[in-house]
């Protein structure tokens, strides 16, 4: 055991948060404690980022009318997605894919503008800025689960429409709509698995040695 390892209880808590993290869609009414929200944002801001560029930006949506407008954008994309799914369209429309009008806090996570100035680590992999934002959101997700707070990542929207709605600068890009709030329970398994939409595959299907050998 490394001398730098956490205690057994601390390690167990971290692995539990990872295992029990869920993409939540069902929330009960009620605000999120401001101190807790700050802790979640601090957790996100502590994420690693390519070239230390910290490309994430968070917009807290507190205006009720704006929340309704965001919901309308998501609902329009939900219907477009259903149409694109073909034979699974009706099945998809039965899924609850967001909790925008129900959650206690609504955030929009975005990529900053003028990202082209940051070349370190992005010259051949420019999408590492998106990877950095994803790390920040995963930090927030795990912190939320540890706090007993539900979090849902909504990706059903047209980024340009949301950018304009929120008066974001040219060159920036909306990445995620984040729902945070109290829940009655956490799903025992991912919701899409509960709803028989998809089944996760075991780890051994995704780990290879030396060469790409999986089908």
Which stretches of residues belong to each language-model region?
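A glycine-rich helix N-cap at a beta->alpha junction
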Residues: 78-84, 168-190
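C-terminal helix-cap and adjacent tail motif
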Residues: 2-13, 17, 24, 177-215
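Glycine-rich phosphate/pyrophosphate-binding beta-alpha loops
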Residues: 45-51
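A short N-terminal beta-strand-loop micro-motif at the entrance of redox/enzyme domains
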Residues: 24-39
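Small-aliphatic-rich amphipathic alpha-helix that forms the alpha element of a beta-alpha
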Residues: 44, 107, 115-165
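Short alpha-helical scaffolding segments that buttress acidic/His motifs in well-ordered protein cores
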Residues: 18, 40-44, 178
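Glycine/small-residue-rich phosphate/adenosyl-binding loop
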Residues: 54-133
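Short secondary-structure boundary segments
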Residues: 111, 156, 182
